[in-house]
Amino acid sequence: MKKTALVIMAAGIGSRFGKGIKQLEPVGPNGEIIMDYSIHDALEAGFNKVVFIIRKDLEKDFKEVIGNRISKITEVEYAFQELDDLPAGFAKPEGRTKPWGTGQAVLACKGLVKEPFAVINADDYYGKDPFVNCTTTSYRSMMWMKLCRSPWQDSCLETP
């Protein structure tokens, strides 16, 4: 079976969430977190590797809540999103404390992911269909995007 990785962005701060780590907060009847559902759906669809993008300060809690358990059923790797891990020619602005976002998060796993992959947010639920579509389509790549004329306009063009 060809290797397909699920890359999970879980380094966010969750500043509006309050106490605790939003990505690790139980939501299911048996203490499941949202990632449990996404990982289950992805593995059922044929994914066979999980890469967690996290902050170094979350590593211990992250492994205790989900990482160690998932590593018993599939290959698991960790990438660490660091504020200073930027492409050549770029520098962190003075005073910046928040993660850069999606692009820099995915860049953090550049040495770990050599196979086709899908990127998801740790705290969003996707359902099984997107993962099935990724593993069964004949396309060489898939992308979902939303193009907005400007960040403050509600009128966006959606491309499936």
PLM-predicted stretches and their roles:
Residues 75, 81-160:
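Conserved beta-loop-beta/alpha segment of the NTase-like Rossmann-fold superfamily
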Residues 2-67:
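N-terminal glycine-rich phosphate-binding loop and ensuing alpha1 helix
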Residues 4, 48-50, 74-76, 148-150:
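Residue-level recognition of the N-termini of beta-strands and the immediately preceding loop/turn
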Residues 10, 54, 80, 121-122:
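Glycine-rich, histidine-containing beta strand-loop boundary motifs that form or position
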Residues 1, 71-73, 145:
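Short, well-ordered coil/turn elements that cap or connect secondary structure elements
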